[in-house]
Curated annotation (Swiss-Prot):
Domain (Glutamine amidotransferase type-1): residue spans on this chain: 292-535
Pfam families from the UniProt entry: CTP_synth_N, GATase
Source species of the chain: Roseiflexus castenholzii (strain DSM 13941 / HLO8)
Sequence positions that bind UTP: S13, K188, T189, K190, P191, T192, Q193, K224
Domain of life: Bacteria
Inhibition and activation profile: Allosterically activated by GTP, when glutamine is the substrate; GTP has no effect on the reaction when ammonia is the substrate. The allosteric effector GTP functions by stabilizing the protein conformation that binds the tetrahedral intermediate(s) formed during glutamine hydrolysis. Inhibited by the product CTP, via allosteric rather than competitive inhibition.
Active-site annotation: C381 (nucleophile), H508, E510
Keyword Iron-sulfur: no
Keywords from the named record: ATP-binding, Glutamine amidotransferase, Ligase, Magnesium, Metal-binding, Nucleotide-binding, Pyrimidine biosynthesis
Gene encoding the protein: pyrG
Name by which UniProt lists this protein: CTP synthase
Subunit-structure text: Homotetramer.
Example of a GO MF term: identical protein binding
Length: 555
């Protein structure tokens, strides 16, 4: 039977539950435990797919096409596992499923109530993860903060789980904040005491308290929390703010959490193998020269909107021995000030995914600037589309008004257009091209050189595609279609041959990057940018016969 770790949060939101859960997963995996993870989100949306990035941050897409919480990205990166739609459950999904069953008559005329119908549906979703993944331990994060009215059915469900699967198979972890009062230099425990009491009111007694703080906490603070929370002192785990999120597993391991969890769950003492992770953290903290990379978007005020892109850039920088210095550039600011003052000091430009026409001309301009000045460029989803639009305007003429029908339904040159199967769709949620799809690569290209194989699978999230009516025209002018669907109908990757490194992809490679294994496209993009930095200017690099950039780039 699988065992379950339920992680709740108290005092304040955004204290680091997601990173804590991901780190616990890493500690257990390092001990040879088969782990899976699930996030329970109390919001009533069915998924975050239609939510504003300002409300929710990034929408993380799983291999099977689910639009999920950004915490799943942390889980995948830390544990190095591909999760599925089972790993993200929302109140909207739960109520939709229960109402559908009621409409079918599955409840035989019974009155539908939160208990037992809603809670049973939640428990069924939790159990499904263990059943379908074969995990020994399922770690379940409950979104929000204890005391939120939306979270009550989820707390009741996880309370019942201890009775359903046995007390020895369930463990509750509460992540809480210890505020530091600057005027007195004190760390206050009272909010944590109240949070633990609030959790007890719904019938849950925490087995472990993870204490988030900006500074290391003294032993007397741990003793005090252990007394009031009625837990072992070793179950009060200090977690102070660290330089890199990838340090967190090592901080928790040093505090003894890994061994404590395995002993409490009856898994025995297992020696962890964290050598590779320690090496990773050492490389992260080692001094490196900074490499300025521009990230051009319209949500740059909220970095969480592009969190997987940021992490993928950092992974690649770590691999290439540079510290990626991300310059957050608003595409609307480019529209106002032009590219030169904002982009002249960067050595690579990334335009990530997005929707809507706000700031779109700034993104198109950034793609054009990279093309004209020989700056390495990586376009992701929308970033590939704006690169296509920019190139088309260059080929056909600026007055052509080449565009995407997403931004101009009446453009005379729709080089980016609706996918045919999207034309009759009216609902927004869950209706895009979502999840992993195969892409066949063209030998002798940057893309093929990066991957080193003939076909790959990458994750998608889009409605619009490259318009094949313009393919021959643009190819004749120097555009290279280096990746396409196996049937040849969909253009997936474009690049420019006479350029240091200029690649646009219709998918989201950032979702598959790992700290120990950077995504090939990000790796080679940063390599090209680093080479440009070494040479001190932007100039074309030779494309060797096997499709790799010059040997100096690979150095």
């Amino acid at each position: 039977m699988a065992k379950y770790i339920f992680v709740t949060g108290g005092v304040a939101s955004s204290v680091g539950k997601g990173i804590t859960v991901a780190s616990i997963g890493r500690l257990l995996k390092a001990r040879g435990v088969r782990v899976s993870v699930q996030k329970l989100d109390p919001y009533i949306n069915v998924d975050p797919g239609t939510m504003s990035p300002y409300q929710h941050g990034e929408v993380f897409v799983t291999e099977d096409g689910a639009e999920t919480d950004l915490d799943l990205g942390h889980y995948e990166r830390f544990i190095d596992v591909n999760l599925t739609r089972l790993s993200n459950v929302t109140t909207g999904q739960i109520y939709s499923a229960v109402i559908q069953k009621e409409r079918r008559g599955d409840y035989l005329g019974g009155t539908i109530q939160v208990i037992p119908h809603i809670t049973n549906e939640i428990k069924a979703r939790i159990a499904a993860v263990a059943r379908q993944t074969g995990a020994e331990v399922v770690i379940v994060e409950i979104g929000g903060t204890v005391g939120d009215i939306e979270g009550l059915p989820f707390l009741e469900a996880i309370r019942q789980m201890r009775k359903d699967v046995g007390r020895d198979n369930v463990l509750y972890i509460h992540v809480t904040l210890l505020p530091h009062i600057g005027a007195t230099g004190e760390v206050k425990t009272k909010p944590t005491q109240h949070s633990v009491m609030e959790l007890r009111r719904v019938g849950i007694t925490a087995d472990v308290i993870v204490c988030r703080s900006d500074y290391p906490i003294a032993d007397e603070i741990r003793d005090k929390i252990a007394l009031f929370a009625d837990v072992d002192v070793e179950a009060v785990v200090p977690l102070h703010t660290v330089e890199s999120i990838y340090e967190v597993p090592l901080v928790l391991e040093e505090a003894g959490l890994g061994n404590y969890l395995t002993l409490r769950l009856g898994l025995g003492v297992r020696e962890p193998n964290l050598d590779d992770w320690r090496d990773l953290v050492a490389r992260i903290k080692a001094p490196k020269r900074k490499l300025a990379i521009a990230l051009v978007g319209k949500y740059v005020e909220l970095h969480d909107a592009y969190i997987s892109v940021v992490e993928a850039l950092r992974h690649a920088g770590l691999h290439q021995g540079v510290d990626v210095d991300i310059r957050w550039i608003s595409s609307e600011q480019i529209e106002e000030e032009g590219c030169e003052p904002l982009l002249r000091d960067v050595y690579g430009i990334v335009v990530p995914g997005g929707f809507g026409d706000r700031g779109i001309e700034g993104k198109i301009a950034a793609a054009g600037y990279a093309r004209e000045h020989g700056v390495p460029y990586l376009g992701l989803c929308l970033g590939m589309q704006v690169a296509t639009i920019s190139f088309a305007r260059h080929v056909i003429g600026a007055e052509s008004r080449a565009n995407s029908t997403e931004f101009d339904l009446h453009t005379p040159h729709p080089v980016i257009d609706f996918m045919p199967d999207q034309l009759d769709i009216t609902d927004k949620g869950g209706t895009m091209r979502l999840g992993g799809y195969p892409c066949r690569l063209l030998p002798g290209t940057r893309a093929h050189a990066a991957y080193g194989v003939d076909q790959v699978v990458e994750r998608h999230r889009h409605r619009f595609e490259f318009n094949n009516k313009y393919r021959r025209l643009l190819e004749s002018a120097g555009l290279v279609v280096s990746g396409q669907s196996p049937d040849g109908r969909l253009v997936e990757i474009i690049e420019l041959r006479d350029h240091p490194w200029y690649v646009g992809v219709q998918f989201h490679p950032e979702f598959r990057s790992r700290p120990e294994r950077p995504h090939p496209l990000f790796r080679d993009f940063i390599a090209a940018a680093a080479q440009t930095f070494r040479e001190g200017d932007q100039r074309p690099l030779p494309l060797e016969q096997n499709g790799t950039v010059g040997a100096a780039v690979k150095a």
